[in-house]
Amino acid sequence: MSYRIGIDIESISDVQAAAEKHKQFLDKVLTKSEQKQLAGRKGNGYYAYLAGRFSSKEAYAKATGFGIGSKVNFTDIEILDDENGAPRLSVSGRSLFLNAKSYQISISHKIKLDLVATEVLIEVEDGNSDS
């Protein structure tokens, strides 16, 4: 096995400003299921959730080495909370990282510091870590 790691840090208020400025931000960044989970958030939790998802998708793109753009779209990456509230990452479409055995994700919010930090770990079958 080999591993690919992506890490990202975002300002919650910067993500909030982008969402408020660009009407299509939510549709561009979040899947419909993620938007449903977001709708249940109130107050600071709303933008912390949004920033966490945005940052997680950036971290995934970094782990693959593709970046967001021609091979990786935000909405091909979905991070939903499981029954215990832990984030679970799934990938579809062009963003699927071939030979990936598993995806692990960690999202840390520090609202008082206006930061969200994320890490994505991709476990890759030996022999080919490229898609």
UniProtKB/Swiss-Prot annotation:
Instruction: Give the signal peptide range.
Output: none
Which UniProt key words apply to this protein? Cytoplasm, Fatty acid biosynthesis, Fatty acid metabolism, Lipid biosynthesis, Lipid metabolism, Magnesium, Metal-binding, Transferase
GO biological process terms held by the UniProt record: fatty acid biosynthetic process
Q: Where in the cell is it found?
A: Cytoplasm
Q: Which Gene3D superfamilies match?
A: 4'-phosphopantetheinyl transferase domain
Query: Which amino acids does the record list as binding Mg(2+)?
Result: 8, 58
Matching InterPro entries, A to Z? 4-PPantetheinyl_Trfase_dom, 4-PPantetheinyl_Trfase_dom_sf, ACPS, Ppantetheine-prot_Trfase_dom
Requisite cofactors: Mg(2+)
What EC number(s) would the UniProt record show? 2.7.8.7
Which Pfam families would you find in this protein's record? Answer: ACPS
User: Can you quote a single GO CC term?
Assistant: cytoplasm
Q: Tell me which domain of life the UniProt entry assigns to the organism this sequence originates from.
A: Bacteria
| Reactions listed under catalytic activity | apo-[ACP] + CoA = holo-[ACP] + adenosine 3',5'-bisphosphate + H(+)
Q: Which GO terms describe its molecular function?
A: holo-[acyl-carrier-protein] synthase activity; magnesium ion binding
Q: Which family does it belong to?
A: Belongs to the P-Pant transferase superfamily. AcpS family.
Q: What does this protein do?
A: Transfers the 4'-phosphopantetheine moiety from coenzyme A to a Ser of acyl-carrier-protein.
Q: What is this protein called?
A: Holo-[acyl-carrier-protein] synthase
Per the UniProt entry, what species is this protein from, by scientific name?
A: Oenococcus oeni (strain ATCC BAA-331 / PSU-1)
